[in-house]
Every structure is written in structure tokens, then in C-alpha cells.
């Protein structure tokens, strides 16, 4: 039955089976039919779901079978028992956050964007300057309630700030950047981008 198009082999009766495995990120997996036979390929586009289309391993499902253009059978119209929506993988759309979800927003340290896992993996989620707490805490001193530009702690400047730590642990290290002095004029209390004197050091 190869060639023209997909052919539905169900004959009206839905088949039952169990999910063998399903890769949420890649969007496909395999179902083991209850009545025996080979495992059937299933793509996320064939899943009936009220939200994110995924399947959980060992989940009971019902499905129709269709033969694709290359003659291989695959599961389609996959649902839970009695046509109910599938339970799916509890990880949802981001597979429980995944590496891409770690860290705060972009920019300098991720503090402002706020990620549930804090500084995360450096350049990926948090920007390049040290990660931050992810919960609006200062990336210089680690205390909540203010940003680094408002920090009263000297010695950090914009040169360090630590690694942010994994999962918001605060990290350690950080360099001594010379306090809160302007790089343009050397005066304390403002940064070069806010400098009005225009003088060079």
C-alpha cells in the first residue's frame, strides 16, 4: 500500500495499547498495541490533547492505525481510554524548564527577568555577566530588594559579580571592580552611561 497517500487500516474499531516511550522534545515515540504486533510510531501531531501534546510512558491509549506513504503503519488520532484526552507528560511545554529555561532574563546578570532557577548556566539563560539570583536580587551582594546599580556595597563594580550559582544558590567569587565609580570621570555615585561631565580619566 505504498504510493498515493496515507491509508487508514482501522476499519472503524479503535485499537488499544500502552505508550512504550515518548520524547517530548523531539515530538515522537512508540505505542505497544494490546493485541500484539509491532510497536507503532506516533507523532505529536496525532495526539488528542487539551494542552501540550505529549504522552507519558506506560499510559493507556486508544488509537487508529494508518499506513504512511512509505508503507509503514503509524498510530493516529491517539487519545486516552474511551476517547478522553491523554494524560501526557507532566513536564508540559518546556520539559520541566529544560536548560533553556534556566536563568533570569538576558542582559547583565538576569536579575530583572527573574527565572525560577536563578543564574542558571551562564551565557544560556542569564546573559553574560554573572547570573544573578533570578528573583530581583542584587548580583553584586546577593541581597534581595535592589539591583546592582543601587547597591551600597563597594567593590564589585561591573567587573565581576560571581557565577550566579546553579539553581539560584547565589554563586561565589566576583571581582573587585573598584566600587561605584564612573569609568569616564572617576567620580563615584554614577556610571559612565549616566556621566554628564564628559571628561575622560
Curated annotation (Swiss-Prot):
Provide the CSD domain boundaries.
Answer: 14-81
Which residues does this entry mark as bearing N-acetylserine? Answer: 2
Q: Enumerate the residue ranges of region (Disordered).
A: 66-109
Family (UniProt): Belongs to the cold shock protein (CSP) family.
Q: Name one Pfam family in it.
A: zf-CCHC
From the Swiss-Prot or TrEMBL record, give the protein name: Cold shock domain-containing protein 4
Say yes or no: keyword Hydrolase present.
Answer: no
Q: What does this protein do?
A: Chaperone that binds to and unwinds RNA and both single-stranded DNA and double-stranded DNA (ssDNA and dsDNA DNA). Regulates the flowering transition and flower and seed development, particularly at late stages of embryo development, through regulation of gene expression (including MEA, FIS2, AP1, CAL, AG and SHP2).
Compositional bias (Gly residues) spans? 89-109
Gene Ontology molecular functions? DNA binding; mRNA binding; zinc ion binding
| Induction summary | Down-regulated during cold acclimation. Accumulation during silique development is AGL15-dependent.
